[in-house]
């Protein structure tokens, strides 16, 4: 199977039952995304497929042949951080760091969702364009769990990147 992950082409011969997360971690040595619960409940495995965030532990790799997949490794480098990565550092949006790759991938995708006008559950009027408010961003990030409780710092990092007030 052919995959494009973080702008790089990969060929992989994996069992059709292999999750996208296991493809990345076990076969391609892209270990940034974490396996927290392996049930889609924690968000530690969040990656983006064609710009849409997914729980990579719940998605079979074979479903994404030919898709453009982005993991935390594809967002920035230690020398040139993605703006969201830099904001997480600035605002201490991490503590133990286990959930951080998934949080950052989700945060990047959340801001893109808002920019594209994708509605959410907290909007009073689904015909209005969503705004990057604290409530809006927190609702959209609710699928990403941080056991250390860095939620306020994560919200501050997202607000900085969005140009909004946390």
Where would I find each of the regions flagged by the language model?
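Signature of N-terminal electron-transfer/Fe-S-associated modules in redox systems
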Residues: 1-166
